[in-house]
Amino acid sequence: MSQQNVTKVGLRIDVDTYRGTRLGVPKLLEIFQRHDISASFFFTVGPDNMGRHIWRLLRPAFLKKMLRSKAASLYGWDILIRGTLWPGPIIGKKLAHIIKQADDAGHEIGLHAWDHHKWQMKTDVMTPAELHSEIDKGYQLLSTLTGKPIPCSAVAGWRCTDATLEQKQRFGFRYNSDCRGESIFIPQLGMAPQIPVTLPTYDELVGKDNIDHSNYNAEIIKLVNPDGLNVYTIHAEVEGIVCAQLFEELIIQAKENNIEFVPMIELLDHEDIDWPLDEILNIEIDGREGWLSHQASMINKQKSA
């Protein structure tokens, strides 16, 4: 690929579950090796209790999303019941070898969560001590597996609070990716920069506005901004399993459109840049149930447009 006019897209892989780690990550590693791509993996390493989300089906917005994305066939029934009748497996202990494979392949390794379900459901009510414990348990296990400090993190479910930011700062992350947005920013003076996710995920697009597998990739490519920040999140449970072929086709089409997927650290460019200050707002968006964290300036622009 010619480096002239290449648009870089930070590629973030969220690994939420035991199934995604066991099946999705190895498949993605194969795809990345075939296409000479380096990316950023964010691992959940604690108990897989994601089946406990089944109670959220009582909420209309969550049920609508599950039906639209055909969740049972997309994620697998084992994910949908994991951790409901008994505690889920500790992913980082059961599947340590797979996490090490991703690290050995040269990909950037970051922390997603200790307990993804707990973080997504309780982060806004946890005490500072509880928040620190959740981050610390994940950090310690993941750094033990890789044998080095963990350079970055991305909260589960894009759910971040001021208290979360304060606790994260204690771990010395080079950057965090905790929200949706449009540009890199500093949430508070002295804090690590935020690299927000700019593009929608598979389950947010498919089934809406006549978007299906036949035109999904074209829609993602259309949304890439050649003049701005681009960060795309995939999930090991989706693009690494059921949608692996669709994702590999996206990689091929991206190359044809002079788009290059890169690890997120490459988007920072220089260590000495003074990133602008901005805030994180927690609001609800169409396509997802509950609140998500967003870059404040982007929301303000949308409101004034």
Curated annotation (Swiss-Prot):
What are the BP-aspect GO terms?
A: 4-amino-4-deoxy-alpha-L-arabinopyranosyl undecaprenyl phosphate biosynthetic process; lipid A biosynthetic process; lipopolysaccharide biosynthetic process; response to antibiotic
Catalyzed reactions: 4-deoxy-4-formamido-alpha-L-arabinopyranosyl di-trans,octa-cis-undecaprenyl phosphate + H2O = 4-amino-4-deoxy-alpha-L-arabinopyranosyl di-trans,octa-cis-undecaprenyl phosphate + formate
Gene Ontology cellular component list? membrane
Enzyme Commission number(s) from the entry:
3.5.1.n3
Q: Which UniProt keywords apply?
A: Antibiotic resistance, Hydrolase, Lipid A biosynthesis, Lipid biosynthesis, Lipid metabolism, Lipopolysaccharide biosynthesis
A molecular function annotated in GO for this UniProt entry is: hydrolase activity, acting on carbon-nitrogen (but not peptide) bonds, in linear amides
InterPro entries given in the database record? ArnD (IPR023557), Glyco_hydro/deAcase_b/a-brl (IPR011330), NODB_dom (IPR002509), Polysacc_deacetylase_ArnD (IPR050248)
- Gene3D superfamilies of this UniProt entry? Glycoside hydrolase/deacetylase (3.20.20.370)
- NodB homology domain location, by residue? 7-262
Involved pathway(s): Glycolipid biosynthesis; 4-amino-4-deoxy-alpha-L-arabinose undecaprenyl phosphate biosynthesis; 4-amino-4-deoxy-alpha-L-arabinose undecaprenyl phosphate from UDP-4-deoxy-4-formamido-beta-L-arabinose and undecaprenyl phosphate: step 2/2; Bacterial outer membrane biogenesis; lipopolysaccharide biosynthesis
Give the similarity note: Belongs to the polysaccharide deacetylase family. ArnD deformylase subfamily.
The task this protein performs is described as: Catalyzes the deformylation of 4-deoxy-4-formamido-L-arabinose-phosphoundecaprenol to 4-amino-4-deoxy-L-arabinose-phosphoundecaprenol. The modified arabinose is attached to lipid A and is required for resistance to polymyxin and cationic antimicrobial peptides.
Per its record, how is this protein called by name? Probable 4-deoxy-4-formamido-L-arabinose-phosphoundecaprenol deformylase ArnD
Q: Which gene encodes it?
A: arnD
